[in-house]
Regions:
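Catalytic phosphate/metal-binding cores of nucleic-acid and nucleotide-processing enzymes, i.e., regions
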Residues: 1-66
């Protein structure tokens, strides 16, 4: 995935699942997109559990963000 384009929800899912490689910033952006769009709560259960863990750890923000 090129850094010059906006990350799509598809890209975010692929990065979260490890199909696409991503650095720490890209992983954080991917999970934030999944939370912000609500996909984290409508995909397989582990997405929601991981999103909750990342929110509780302060890695990403809950939606809506301040």
């Amino acid at each position: 995935m090129k850094d010059t384009k906006k990350m799509t929800t598809f890209d975010a899912v692929m990065i979260a699942e490890g199909v696409y490689p991503g650095d720490t910033d890209q992983m954080q952006e991917a999970w934030q997109i999944l939370v912000d769009t609500g996909l984290a709560w409508s995909l397989q259960g582990w997405f929601g559990r991981e999103a909750t863990r990342l929110i509780e750890a302060g890695v990403i923000q809950p939606f809506p963000r301040p």
